[in-house]
Amino acid sequence: MSEKLRTILDLLSCPDDGRPLRLDREQLVCSGCGRGFPLHEDFAEILPRHAARLPASASADYRGAYRSLFERPYQKDDTCLAWGAEEGATPSWIRKRQRQVAAMRPLVTEGIEAAASVLCDIAAGAGHYTFAYAPQFRFVLHCDLSVENLNYARRKARERHLENIFFLRIDYFQPPFRRSLDRILCLDTLIRGEAHDAMLLKSIADSLQTSGTAVIDFHNWWHNPFRRLGLLPENFHSNKSYRRSETEILLAETAFGSATVFPFVQEFNPGSRLDRICSRMVPSTRIVYRVRGGPRAPAESAPFSRQHRR
């Protein structure tokens, strides 16, 4: 692992001071503050010294869960399940996830050089996307804060003989990247409210190279407005769904160079005849954007382009 890690070392930096990391025996060491970050077989823990200060609007439940995940020491466990693991999901849920993996693939892989490109999933969870896209990239950075998610994903990657994935335990509010990444993925994560999601978007923007791209998504409020209005039982609980105008405001306040929207309807197989006919009449399940890095002041407005307006 240590020698293999050298190939991506120039992508990593200290989450505290942003200085480069160097490999020193069985740990990574910051060239500035001198902090050491442990290596465990096939993954590295690169957490900041302190947890992030969450916005006042964050729920007590989320605050507690975040703090618990951040403070939990690593312990290897070959039996745990990640959130969203197929072993604990319904067939219907799995089909929807597989459709999204298929729909996102061209957005993630367009223009890559398979022998050189690196994909970073900044909140990778059970690995649905990283495992599917790994064969098309030289390396994949599978990042998460949860010990359970990382243990599960490492186990599944070994079972599938995927050897080009690096597992990194990070805090996505303070990631160990400084304008070093060419391709970032962040799906099913921008759901905790505007303040939380703005913090995460800034982290993504600060991690992207000027020429890099990120694929992100928001849950669409209009996909099921009756639930959002309380006329049907709510199945999204305290999480946040967005209207298109709200997502554009969030992105305009973040230092991205441009943003292109790709609405996605998860009820139909991507590219199928039913998808081509019905997806224009059904509000999109997710509002997906491909955003580009760029040296732009946060107060400026990102230029938007659209595939469809829904």
Language-model regions: role of each:
Residues 2-68:
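N-terminal auxiliary segments of SAM/dcSAM-dependent transferases
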Residues 185-186:
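A conserved beta-strand element that flanks and buttresses the S-adenosyl-L-methionine
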Residues 217-238:
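Short, glycine-/aromatic-enriched active-site segment of Class I SAM-dependent methyltransferases
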Residues 239-255:
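Short alpha-helix
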Residues 259-288, 292:
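Conserved catalytic loop of SAM-dependent methyltransferase domains
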